[in-house]
Amino acid sequence: MGVVRAARQVGLPVAISFTVETDGHLPDGTPLASAIQQVDADDGGPDWYLVNCAHPTHIEPGLTGHGGWRERIAGLLPNASTLTHAELDAAEELDEGDPAELAAACDRLRPLLPSLSIVGGCCGTDARHVAALWGVPGPG
């Protein structure tokens, strides 16, 4: 990937983030493991991978299998909603989901992602969701 090569040329750390559909595969059908392994093989890989713009219940099915590829994922930036990307694109109102449910779903992924150190939010999230993800009191 060009971004990895460019960052390496100037000595910058670099991360690549993938999104997944409800089955844990990339939108083109590529399994998450295969995508990470392919980028690592082609370019030596970024310093970190993240998964973003998908609810944790959509990410979880993609975290199966063996190998060190799951250790390469350092971050999750999940959507608040459990709706599919197509449903979100067609929605006329923001689906904010449930902050506690989002946090619980992310917590279930922690044992599968031993390098997880970046947790934030993507579509539909706000300070309430991030507070729940980090287990701190939310705005009030």
Predicted regions and their residues:
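Domain-level signal for soluble alpha/beta catalytic cores
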Residues: 1-140
